[in-house]
Amino acid sequence: MIFEKPKRVRLKGKALSDLNRKIHNRDHNRCVICGAWVDPGKKYHHEPCGINKSDEEQKGVVLCDTCHFQRHNGKNSLEIREKIEEYLKKCYE
């Protein structure tokens, strides 16, 4: 059996800016974890992050700097990931 890697979407320029605006609009420029206001120019967070990240609306969320740092480096990284996944699932059910 052959397993195919999921295709990752990579956007640049206007397409990436438009996607960032859509994600910020969906999330009302608020961190989906703590509710803090986030500047609309701040790039969204990919979930999943790392090598599997993909520039897609249903895979991005707005995070404040603190929650973004915690998602990547904190003791509660797994908890934050689960909250993000739950939030995105509710958005696209």
Predicted features, each with a name:
Residues 1-28, 35-41, 73, 77-93:
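A boundary/linker detector
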Residues 32-62, 71, 75:
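Histidine-centered nuclease catalytic patch
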Residues 50-66, 84-93:
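Short microdomains enriched in Cys/His and/or Lys/Arg
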